[in-house]
């Protein structure tokens, strides 16, 4: 018997994977979205969180970008 689960395959570098795993761990148990951690750079997540992950990564990158100070 085969069990099929609909989800989204996420491929990213190791720091982004850790960021997504940390997001998942900070959620209450009923809202956890990672179905399976495939390896250090690939995750299988529930399809309804794709946009939330994209937004969180975008915000994270904006916060970590360097802006040259104006003198």
UniProtKB/Swiss-Prot annotation:
Its main location: nucleus. Pfam families: Tfb5. GO terms for cellular component: transcription factor TFIIH core complex. It is found in: Nucleus. The keyword Manganese does not apply. Coiled coil: none annotated. GO terms for biological process: nucleotide-excision repair; transcription initiation at RNA polymerase II promoter. InterPro entries: TFB5-like_sf (IPR035935), TFIIH_TTDA/Tfb5 (IPR009400). Transmembrane segments: none annotated. Keywords: DNA damage, DNA repair, Nucleus, Transcription, Transcription regulation. Component of the general transcription and DNA repair factor IIH (TFIIH) core complex, which is involved in general and transcription-coupled nucleotide excision repair (NER) of damaged DNA and, when complexed to CAK, in RNA transcription by RNA polymerase II. In NER, TFIIH acts by opening DNA around the lesion to allow the excision of the damaged oligonucleotide and its replacement by a new DNA fragment. In transcription, TFIIH has an essential role in transcription initiation. Belongs to the TFB5 family. Component of the 7-subunit TFIIH core complex composed of XPB, XPD, TFB1/GTF2H1, GTF2H2/P44, TFB4/GTF2H3, TFB2/GTF2H4 and TFB5/GTF2H5, which is active in NER. The core complex associates with the 3-subunit CDK-activating kinase (CAK) module composed of CYCH1/cyclin H1, CDKD and MAT1/At4g30820 to form the 10-subunit holoenzyme (holo-TFIIH) active in transcription. This is General transcription and DNA repair factor IIH subunit TFB5.
